[in-house]
């Protein structure tokens, strides 16, 4: 048994302008090579573009997009008796949000377009409307979990 205590769960910090934890999570995921100021620039430009496109509160669009992409259930590989099964597992809210952000950023990176701010804003608006690559990824994950429902007892 381990002698060390369990690590306390850190509270997510919020960003300086919008005072929003989701924005900060997005910044930390978009970050590359330690260039945080560039990550903030990209996010804030994307938020401005969302404001121009939808003429609504961009943070509510962001929340709606993340809520729409967040998966409830996923599959995990589990080895049972020499064969590997995809076992459906429920996902917690924090892990679900992290997955949603990862999928949104992945989908926006794959998009054709001028710059990352433009691509991210387009993907967020699409996800808020219920379309886009990230939403398709969520639906695909749910389909996989539904197809492998028979292995749920391996949990």
Curated annotation (Swiss-Prot):
InterPro entries: Ribosomal_uS7, Ribosomal_uS7_bac/org-type, Ribosomal_uS7_CS, Ribosomal_uS7_dom, Ribosomal_uS7_dom_sf
Main subcellular location: plastid
SUPFAM superfamilies, alphabetized: Ribosomal protein S7
Subunit structure, interactors included: Part of the 30S ribosomal subunit.
Task of the protein: One of the primary rRNA binding proteins, it binds directly to 16S rRNA where it nucleates assembly of the head domain of the 30S subunit.
Family from the record: Belongs to the universal ribosomal protein uS7 family.
This protein's name: Small ribosomal subunit protein uS7cz/uS7cy
């Amino acid at each position: 048994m381990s002698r060390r205590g369990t690590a306390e769960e850190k509270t997510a910090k919020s960003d300086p302008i919008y005072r929003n934890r989701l924005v900060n999570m997005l910044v930390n995921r978009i970050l590359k090579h330690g260039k945080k100021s560039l990550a903030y620039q990209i996010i804030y430009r994307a938020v401005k573009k969302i404001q121009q496109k939808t003429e609504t509160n961009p943070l509510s669009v962001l929340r709606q997009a993340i809520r729409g992409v967040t998966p409830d259930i996923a599959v995990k590989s589990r080895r049972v008796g020499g064969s590997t099964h995809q076992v459906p597992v429920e996902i917690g809210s924090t892990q679900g949000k992290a997955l949603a952000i990862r999928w949104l950023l992945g989908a926006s990176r794959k998009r054709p377009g001028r710059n990352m701010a433009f691509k991210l804003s387009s993907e967020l608006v699409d996800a808020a409307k219920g379309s886009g690559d990230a939403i398709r990824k969520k639906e695909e994950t749910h389909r996989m979990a539904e197809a492998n429902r028979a292995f749920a007892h391996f949990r």
